UniProtKB/Swiss-Prot annotation:
The keyword DNA-binding appears for this protein: no
EC category name: hydrolase
PANTHER family registered for this protein in UniProt: DNA-3-METHYLADENINE GLYCOSYLASE
EC number(s) recorded for this UniProt protein: 3.2.2.-
Name the UniProt record assigns to this protein: Putative 3-methyladenine DNA glycosylase
InterPro entries: Formyl_transferase-like_C_sf, MPG, MPG_sf
Gene3D superfamilies: Methylpurine-DNA glycosylase (MPG)
GO molecular function (one): alkylbase DNA N-glycosylase activity
Entry similarity comment: Belongs to the DNA glycosylase MPG family.
Domain of life of the native organism: Bacteria
Organism name: Psychrobacter cryohalolentis (strain ATCC BAA-1226 / DSM 17306 / VKM B-2378 / K5)
Amino acid sequence: MLASQVVSSVVKPSWFARPTCVVAADLIGKVLCRELTDSDGQQKILRMRISETEAYIGEGDAACHAHAGTRTPRTEIMYHIGGVFYVYLTYGIHHMLNLVSGPTESPEAVLIRAGFLIEGSARLMNEQLLDVNRQLNHIKQLAGPGKLTKGLQIDRTLYGKPITPASKVWVEDDGCQPLVSLRPRIGIDYAGDAKEWLLRYIWTDHPSLSKK
């Protein structure tokens, strides 16, 4: 089938209500879409194919914000049924994009760690950015959750919104199914044994990864 014949479908919020580890693995190869308005008032859609995710699996996961039932105003959205966004700020600088997953009252989510732009999106994004030093011409420009949200202009205004086109951020499926490998999660040395759990899902050997 020619690339022009590939048909994408919008992933429905109910898709995210499945087990979190399944969602995290199945997101590899999916397309994260971001609708933006340029300086001329024109709408554009940036598309990033997801190459790396991490699963956070609830109160028994010491790396999860809701570990041991830590239910706070910030983490409340994690108790929602899968299909909404959980975005938070880390180190006072970087926004982290999480897709809430699993059943209601089970605080779980998938962190989007890395991806790469497709279908002319690099050109569209560079038109959006006036500073040539910020232009996204390299395969690793979205390699890392902070770089990713900065590049796609995602912040906490997305918190709690449904994962649908109405929120201007959504996921599409065009049938891409790459080989997926499992690795330990990154940056969670505080999490005891949980830091060794194989809950980071990567597109095997893809150059866009934040870490192989």
